[in-house]
Amino acid sequence: MSIDTKAIEKHIRGILIALGDDPDREGLKETPKRVAKMYEEVFKGMEYSNDDIAEMFNKTFEEDLKESEEDNIVLVKDIEIFSHCEHHLTLMYNMTVAVAYIPNKRLIGLSKIARIADMVSRRLQLQERIGKDIAEIMEKVTASKDIAVIIKGEHGCMTSRGIKKPGALTTTMTLKGRFKNDDSLVTKLMALYKA
């Protein structure tokens, strides 16, 4: 699926008219085109399924891990992303993502983890789904069932409208495999996360 920038331009022009403004006035003439171009960039992830993203970033390194390394956690944290809430199209911002996995013969390059988080966030999203999508893609790429994703962020639908509570943070956690059932692993994960 590709993003239809011409349709976006047309509809943004209609929104400007519906708001009671003149889309042909100076300052707004190029706005529909600028918004369409911005949407093409910030919603780039909508062009790809989770399978597509997994294929994009599937370069891994095969490692012969010893049994003593079975509980070694790889954690990449403080990955900054932004997204847009699918309910109000408002910005989800000041978002940080932490992705952890226990390697199972395949190691992924650390920058690929950040790229996966970035691509998944470039969709109309829910914070909970961002975590689920990242975990699903990580499982496909690394073949590890043991994945954890922690996300913190602010939501424009809470800070700029409705209840208007700036600074309210939403935290979500997606746990798969042993992270879901092994309290000692979760304790180890949280110690790494807070370090």
Curated annotation (Swiss-Prot):
Q: Which residues bind Zn(2+)?
A: 85, 88, 157
Q: Which Pfam families does this one have?
A: GTP_cyclohydroI
UniProt KW keywords: GTP-binding, Hydrolase, Metal-binding, Nucleotide-binding, One-carbon metabolism, Zinc
* PROSITE patterns referenced in this protein's UniProt entry, alphabetically: GTP_CYCLOHYDROL_1_1 (PS00859)
* Gene3D superfamilies linked: 1.10.286.10, 3.30.1130.10
**Cysteine-cysteine disulfides:** none
The UniProt entry's GO CC annotations, sorted and at most eight, read: cytoplasm
Belongs to which family?
A: Belongs to the GTP cyclohydrolase I family.
Which HAMAP family would you find in this protein's record? FolE
Its recorded name reads: GTP cyclohydrolase 1
Originating species: Clostridium acetobutylicum (strain ATCC 824 / DSM 792 / JCM 1419 / IAM 19013 / LMG 5710 / NBRC 13948 / NRRL B-527 / VKM B-1787 / 2291 / W)
Q: What is the lineage of its organism?
A: Bacteria, Bacillati, Bacillota, Clostridia, Eubacteriales
Instruction: Please name the gene that encodes this protein.
Output: folE
